[in-house]
């Protein structure tokens, strides 16, 4: 904004309280403030028709540095003039921090101008020259914030890390902001508390998720072990089932073989029964004629024995005739007389031996013939 439009304390511009309610400051301080403001760089031009481009509920980050360049140009709940005064105040602080090698007179004039600006901003915020539309806040109106609490809450920056030191500086700047614009400081403090609560809820949620993940991992490990045991049992049962199937097939083959053997035996038994029945029908006739061949065989054997004895006697007689031709002639002429004469001892012994031989042969031949007859009758 141009210097002509920048409100200066005691200028009577819009947004400042009337002349009657203004505090009368020393003329030297006013001149010093006017001199410092004239040396400040021009502010960027802003469109007065669109003053609030951002949402009021937009939360600010925790590490926001309020002393950065252009930090006071953001929207606030106060009037436009109050925002411009606060921006001027921050720019004056920046100039004081960067110009440390300036003279003591310039430092005193800068501090005097800053004090005058702060006093004017506080008076404008307290009395309010004109009522404007106030946007609703997302927090309770009864909640208030004290600068002493904010300053006390921020510990010393000695021995802290960069992030903690930045937070402490931010808290200190927020305390200074509470003196100038308490509503904006209240909103920033509420946003910080909400962010802290959200972060805490997020951490709890993450911890709960980690606990659930660990529980699920433990269950997965247990289930994996159980699955391995079940797979091993299943493999054993499958092998046993295969062995039982092989045994069942072997038993079925044995049963089929037994059935075939039984059928063969039944057919053979039936055939033997049929053959036995046929033989039983023709066996009676053969038994009736079984005794006659035996009788004929016995008579024939006796006849053969007699013939053998006669042949032996004839041979013996021929020998006697050759040895004793005279005795043979007498025996031929007188056979009866020859029979009456006693035989020679040698001749008698030979005759007895021949008779014994005939007796031994005759029982054996009769028994064999009798056995042959029995076997023939039983076979028939």
Curated annotation (Swiss-Prot):
SUPFAM superfamilies from the xrefs? Leucine zipper domain
Write out the entry's keywords from A to Z: Activator, DNA-binding, Nucleus, Transcription, Transcription regulation
Q: What is its main location?
A: nucleus
Tissue expression, as annotated, is: Expressed at high levels in levels in leaf sheath, moderate levels in leaf blade, but not in roots. Predominantly expressed in vascular tissues.
Enumerate the residue ranges of region (Leucine-zipper). 209-244
Cell location: Nucleus
Q: List the PROSITE patterns hit by this protein, alphabetically.
A: BZIP (PS50217)
Give all residue intervals belonging to the bZIP domain.
181-244
Q: Which Pfam family, any one, appears in the UniProt record?
A: bZIP_1
**Region listing for Disordered, in residue ranges:** 1-57, 326-380
GO CC, sorted alphabetically, is: nucleus
- UniProt region (Activation of RTBV promoter), positions on chain: 56-108
Q: Which GO terms describe its molecular function?
A: DNA binding; DNA-binding transcription factor activity
> Where are the annotated segments for Basic motif?
183-204
Database matches in InterPro entries: bZIP, bZIP_RF2, bZIP_sf
**Residue stretches of biased makeup (Low complexity):** 16-33, 326-355
Q: What does this protein do?
A: Transcription factor probably involved in vascular development and shoot tissue organization. Binds to the DNA sequence 5'-CCGAGTGTGCCCCTGG-3' present in the promoter region Box II of the phloem-specific rice tungro bacilliform virus (RTBV) promoter. May regulate tissue-specific expression of the RTBV promoter and virus replication.
Per its UniProt record, what PANTHER family does this chain match?
TRANSCRIPTION FACTOR POSF21-RELATED, TRANSCRIPTION FACTOR RF2A
Name used for this protein in its record = Transcription factor RF2a
Q: Which organism is it from?
A: Oryza sativa subsp. japonica (Rice)
**Gene that this sequence comes from:** RF2a
């Amino acid at each position: 904004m141009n210097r002509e439009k920048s409100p200066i304390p005691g200028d009577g511009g819009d947004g400042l309280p009337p002349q009657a309610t203004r505090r009368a400051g020393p003329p030297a301080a006013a001149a010093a403030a006017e001199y410092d403001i004239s040396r400040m760089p021009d502010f960027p031009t802003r469109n007065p028709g669109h003053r609030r481009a951002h949402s009021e509920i937009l939360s600010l980050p925790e590490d926001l540095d309020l002393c950065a360049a252009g930090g006071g140009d953001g929207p606030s709940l106060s009037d436009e003039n109050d925002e411009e005064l606060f921006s001027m105040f921050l720019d004056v602080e920046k100039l004081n921090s960067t110009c440390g090698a300036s003279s003591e007179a310039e430092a005193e004039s800068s501090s005097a101008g800053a004090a005058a600006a702060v006093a004017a901003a506080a008076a404008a915020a307290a009395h309010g020259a004109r009522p404007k539309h106030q946007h609703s806040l997302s927090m309770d109106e009864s909640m208030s914030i004290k600068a002493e609490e904010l300053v006390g809450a921020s510990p010393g920056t000695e021995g802290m890390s960069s992030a903690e030191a930045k937070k402490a500086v931010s808290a200190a700047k927020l305390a200074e902001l509470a003196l100038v614009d308490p509503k904006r400081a209240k909103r920033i403090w509420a946003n910080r508390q909400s962010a802290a609560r959200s972060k805490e809820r997020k951490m709890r949620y993450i911890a709960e998720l980690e606990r659930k993940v660990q529980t699920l991992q433990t269950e997965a490990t247990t289930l994996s072990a159980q699955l391995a045991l079940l797979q091993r049992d299943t493999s054993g049962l499958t092998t046993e089932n295969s062995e039982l199937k092989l045994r069942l097939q072997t038993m079925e083959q044995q049963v089929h073989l037994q059935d075939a053997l039984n059928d063969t035996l039944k057919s053979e038994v039936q055939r033997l029964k049929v053959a036995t029945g046929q033989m039983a029908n023709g066996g009676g006739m053969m038994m009736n004629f079984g005794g006659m061949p035996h009788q004929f065989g016995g008579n024939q054997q006796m006849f053969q024995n007699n013939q053998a004895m006669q042949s032996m006697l004839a041979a013996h007689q021929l020998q006697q005739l050759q040895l004793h031709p005279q005795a043979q002639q007498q025996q031929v002429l007188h056979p009866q007389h020859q029979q009456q004469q006693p035989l020679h001892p040698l001749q008698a012994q030979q005759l007895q031996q021949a008779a014994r031989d005939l007796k031994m042969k005759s029982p054996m031949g009769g028994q064999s013939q009798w056995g042959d007859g029995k076997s023939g009758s039983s076979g028939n």
